[in-house]
């Protein structure tokens, strides 16, 4: 099993718009129905107003890799380019 903590460092003042765009595209709804996905949840950082945290858990790496090749993932990349300054990923395998 693997969990990724993905911190999106949004452009100043863009976190709410980024999150709304993610919701409008159905990123989470699509992802939670993919094979091997156990968790795909967003969290707002209380002390970092421009950060959005995604915690995603997968049963195996191959299925997470498949997620990264979906059309919805490609659309996510376009949103990141528009709304985010950078992204940091912490990966945990267990």
Give the label of every model feature segment.
Residues 61-71, 86, 90-92:
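Catalytic cores of transferase enzymes with a strong primary signal for eukaryotic protein kinases
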Residues 11-13, 94:
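Generic structural motif
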Residues 2-9, 39-68:
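Short, well-ordered beta-strand segments in beta-rich or mixed alpha/beta enzyme
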């Amino acid at each position: 099993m693997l969990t990724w903590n993905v911190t999106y460092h949004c452009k100043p003042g863009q976190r709410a718009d980024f999150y709304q765009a993610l919701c409008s595209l159905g990123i989470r709804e699509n992802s939670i129905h993919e094979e091997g996905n156990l968790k795909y949840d967003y969290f707002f950082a209380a002390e970092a107003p421009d950060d959005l945290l995604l915690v995603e858990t997968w049963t195996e790496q191959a299925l997470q890799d498949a997620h990264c090749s979906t059309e919805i993932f490609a659309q996510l990349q376009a949103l990141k380019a528009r709304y985010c300054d950078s992204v940091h990923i912490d990966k945990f395998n267990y």
